[in-house]
Amino acid sequence: MSKVWSFQRWLIAFFMAFLSVSYANASDQVQNQETAKSKGKILVVMTNHSAYPTRSDKTGLWLTELTHFYDVAKAAGYDMDFVSPQGGVVPLDERSMKPIYVDKSARKLLADRQFMYRLNHTLAPSSIDPTHYKAIYYTGGHGTMWDFPDNKELKNISESIYRQGGIVSAVCHGVGGLLPLVGEDGKPLISGRTVTGFANKEETLSGIKSQVPFSLQNSLINHGAKYKQGFLPFTSYVVSDDR
């Protein structure tokens, strides 16, 4: 994952497709205070997994795949809850913390005590009521490959949000969280739908191919998805199909 992500463009494209963006007046009295009139809640999913099989460095959440989304969603008037498969602390991928990747937005949130408290005290899936959310967003980072696909509680939450008319979305390796989802017809939710996600060639180029438990690209295709990827690796690429 050694690259510079263009997630601001990705996020703008995503929200142009799915959300009507309107900027609310934020209070100057409390740092990081949620907008006064919320348009609803988004459930943001993050990994608890930090260990590679043989590498000494640690994986986890790729930081800006959270921070860029957080900034855009908050500016659009949405509240967010943070959840992880086990609840509690979310590890940060070591490489995502390098200066080349940590931009102004990420630095600001890293210095925000309230934001960091939430990152270190994420909710457990058992505490989530899906009816409270208009969308669910799976963040990325290699850690998600271990604890997103097999989590039955997150699966049930996502399916409930979708069936009540909500949006199911993901970025990068977080797309693995969509693999177990099943539609009302009993078929994989992504079957027949256009999706994207971290590509095989990107795993090879990033040097992590031998570490991950499965190929995300192959698994998406095996679940019936119409997999698409950008012409160049590690560049901004977004697709949407229904919600």
Roles of regions detected by a PLM:
Residues 171-174:
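Short, thiol/selenol-centered motifs that function as redox-active sites or metal-ligating centers
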